[in-house]
Amino acid sequence: MIFQTPIVTPFGGAEHDWSAIELAAWLALSLGTTLRLLGTEADPASGRRDASRLLARASLLVQQVVGIVTEPLLIPPGDAGDVEAAADARMLVVGLSERWREEGIGAVRGAVGRAARAPLLFVRSGSHPRGVSPPQTMTRFTWTQATRHAQTRQPTR
């Protein structure tokens, strides 16, 4: 049974965003619903291109790894676009900023959290590689962990 209310995830391609879409995709699959990926529209004044290529790549990876079809949607930058696009969401899954330890969740995420009608889950990446993210996004934590493991292994005799 497919529910009409999607899991919604804003996506900008940052490390924690990849973890958020992976978790959101698995939630959507288990709940029998769809996944809506949000990316920003172009801003000609600042020379910023839209996120359509990024959303297409993420959508393809989600489809290949998790097996669900995503709904990419371009929205205006800022919290208002996220809130409007998530108005019918079953759940909102949001990756934290790379600066979350120093700055907290940030102004936009805070505004989305206050205005969201659906349950909201903030996600950060862990030390384990993800199945959805492209190989070049392997984190420094994973490399550090692998290095420590190699250094502590005892030679076999």
For the regions a protein language model found, what residue spans apply to each?
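Short beta-strand elements at the ligand-binding edges of bilobed clamshell
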Residues: 6-12
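A structural signal for isolated positions on well-ordered beta-strands in alpha/beta enzyme cores
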Residues: 8, 34-38, 71, 121
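Short, flexible loop segments at the rims of nucleotide/cofactor-binding pockets, characterized by
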Residues: 13, 69-74, 98-99
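Generic hydrophobic alpha-helical scaffold/packing signal
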Residues: 8, 25, 55-63, 71, ...
